[in-house]
């Protein structure tokens, strides 16, 4: 490794905090942390520090929480730190050119996809939702575009049918942190070898909206199971029965192209193995759900309790 770098770290959620923790265990020096301002959180809506700020405070690292980086004052504050590089992981603020140009080696970003596929805010969700078989992390030198910078390093990992956004995020956090450190260890050489992103294969991972969480039972079994996994743990998919919302947390495919005469959304059967529901092209087995005002339960637990709302013949709605 070359001489340890003076690093400014910019990030906000737990995913970024994992990267910061790994960076603090490396030979590189974290001289300051940038993160989003404290936000109201929890039932009491108390101002709460971001996970990244919490890690920084534990290590007595200076924390900056600007509302914007577009002022001359913010540029001057960053210049005063004399950083070699700025590492950005799910920060949440746009970096103008005046900021990108301050560090000696520029700003690098850890993005949770194999660019140029899934540029944007929700790459992990969208990869699962689309049925991708593979994803990973891309380390890029940032420019003024949306995840358009030259690529320094890529690390890949498979997506299985058991992955949710929650579990895959945890795996990519570990992979991303390891890849970040190895990138910083060889940064000058990697910058010289940086590769432009290909023009082919560009897709955008738009932010998840709450409206997307409502299951459309006319969709294919594959699309529905992928969506349930993609929106777990947040915001969580739901369906409607008797005017009430039922959250769907886990589901598996019963069969592709299974023949059924029941309308999409119809409950076919219920036993301890699963709740069988018709879809646009077959059947799906819901194995974990959450009834109104209840905690999430396995279907076996529901069968042992009060399964009345889930009687065969009832039909889930696709509209509020």
Task: Please report, for each region that a protein language model flagged, where it lies by residue.
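N-terminal beta-loop-helix "entrance" segment that forms/cooperates
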Residues: 39-57
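An anion-binding loop in the catalytic cleft
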Residues: 218-320
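Donor/substrate-binding cores of folate-linked one-carbon enzymes
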Residues: 26, 36, 85-204, 209-211
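N-terminal Rossmann-like dinucleotide-binding module
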Residues: 1-43
């Amino acid at each position: 490794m070359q001489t340890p770098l003076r690093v400014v770290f910019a990030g906000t959620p737990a995913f970024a905090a994992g990267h910061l923790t790994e960076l603090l265990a490396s030979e590189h020096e974290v001289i300051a942390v940038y993160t989003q301002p404290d936000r109201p959180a929890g039932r009491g809506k108390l101002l709460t520090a971001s996970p990244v700020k919490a890690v920084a405070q534990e290590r007595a690292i200076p924390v900056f929480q600007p509302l914007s980086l577009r002022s001359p004052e913010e540029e001057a504050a960053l210049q005063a730190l004399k950083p070699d590089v700025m590492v950005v992981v799910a920060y949440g603020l746009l970096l103008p050119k005046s900021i990108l140009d301050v560090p000696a080696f520029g700003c690098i970003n850890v993005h949770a996809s194999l660019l140029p596929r899934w540029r944007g805010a929700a790459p992990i969700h969208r990869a699962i939702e689309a049925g991708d078989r593979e994803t990973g992390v891309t380390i890029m030198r940032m420019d003024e575009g949306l995840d358009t910078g030259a690529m320094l390093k890529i690390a890949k990992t498979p997506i299985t049918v058991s992955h949710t956004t929650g579990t895959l995020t945890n795996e990519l956090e570990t992979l991303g942190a390891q890849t970040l450190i190895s990138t910083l260890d060889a940064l000058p050489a990697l910058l010289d070898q940086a590769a432009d992103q290909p023009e082919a294969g560009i897709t955008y991972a738009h932010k998840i909206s709450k409206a997307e969480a409502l299951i459309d039972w006319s969709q294919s079994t594959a699309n529905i199971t992928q969506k349930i996994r993609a929106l777990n743990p947040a915001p969580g998919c739901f369906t409607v029965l008797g005017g009430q919302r039922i959250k769907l947390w886990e589901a598996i495919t019963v069969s592709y192209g299974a023949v059924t005469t029941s309308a999409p959304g119809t409950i076919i059967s219920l036993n301890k193995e699963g709740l069988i529901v018709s879809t646009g092209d077959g059947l799906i087995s819901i194995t974990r759900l959450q009834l109104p005002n209840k905690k999430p339960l396995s279907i076996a637990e529901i069968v042992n309790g009060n399964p009345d709302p889930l009687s065969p013949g009832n039909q889930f709605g696709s509209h509020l």
